[in-house]
Amino acid sequence: MTLNKVKGDIFSQIGYSIAFAVDATYKCDVGICKQLDDKFRVEALLKSLPEDATRWKGKGYCVAFTSGTQDLYALVVKSLPQKYPDYSNIKEALMSLAADVSRKNSILTPKIAMPKICCGSYDKRDWDKIESLIFDAFRGIDCEILIVEKD
């Protein structure tokens, strides 16, 4: 796995799937989730998936889906919008994403763009810890992770 960081717009990263953190209600009304919902109707798409694929079971998980031609990964890291994600749920969601990426990388090296998940003004997690979880989850997997920070 290679991890790179850039400043810019996550939507201008051509050829990248987009991963983002969300709660289990799939409410997309703030931050990057709101932007994704405005562009790709993320909330409605997630809520339309079969219940087994999207049910909160007390630990983090990843939901892979597509909107038009854009592949998306919702990292479900907490039960409700007003809760703070704990690192174990973030780790579980990243491990679920890594497992999905590992299954799909038979032809092309997967490329995933994501913001600094769970580190915004609301969730307030420590980026150094999150970055370490990303490295742990993707160790040995052939993929590229691009962390996109706003300008």
Role assignments for model-derived ranges:
Residues 1-151:
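Macrodomain-like recognition of ADP-ribose-binding/processing modules
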